[in-house]
Amino acid sequence: MQILVVDDETDVCTLFQQRFRKELRAQKLNFAFASSGKEALHYLHSHTTEAITVLSDINMPGMSGLELLRHIREEFETSPPDVIMITAYGDTENYNQALSLGASDFLTKPLNFNLLRQKLQLES
């Protein structure tokens, strides 16, 4: 399974690699990381033959996660990736906006990694 994590915080990469060490070792998961929405779109356009799940932070400088989601839904209409939005703000406005733009799911920080494993359909 290919996962693209989009977050402007550099320590997120290390956190995901630590929390999913078992799955990475068993080659059940492969992570790619993008530090901006623009970088994420470039990655998605260059990996169109792969099934990718995107985990994107909402609050990022430049292109927000919601703007990224809008671009993904417009640019990948025929085979859009699943997009799970992640935010430190658990308000209903972000939740409703993400779902109305086509998000597959929504998680709040700090992340519950067992819940994320369930959403990614991985064993706990």
Where do the language-model regions lie?
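Receiver (REC) domain active-site loop signature in two-component systems and cognate sites
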Residues: 60
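C-terminal output helix
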Residues: 93, 111-120
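Helix N-cap/capping motif at the beta->alpha junctions
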Residues: 33-42, 65
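Alpha4 helix (beta4-alpha4-beta5 surface) of REC/receiver domains from two-component response regulators
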Residues: 67, 79-80, 90-105
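Active-site beta3 strand of CheY-like receiver
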Residues: 48-55
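Short amphipathic alpha-helix used as the core "switch/output" element in two-component signaling
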Residues: 42, 66-79
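Two-component/phosphorelay signaling modules centered on CheY-like receiver
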Residues: 10-32
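Hydrophobic/aromatic residues positioned on beta-strands within the core alpha/beta folds
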Residues: 84-86
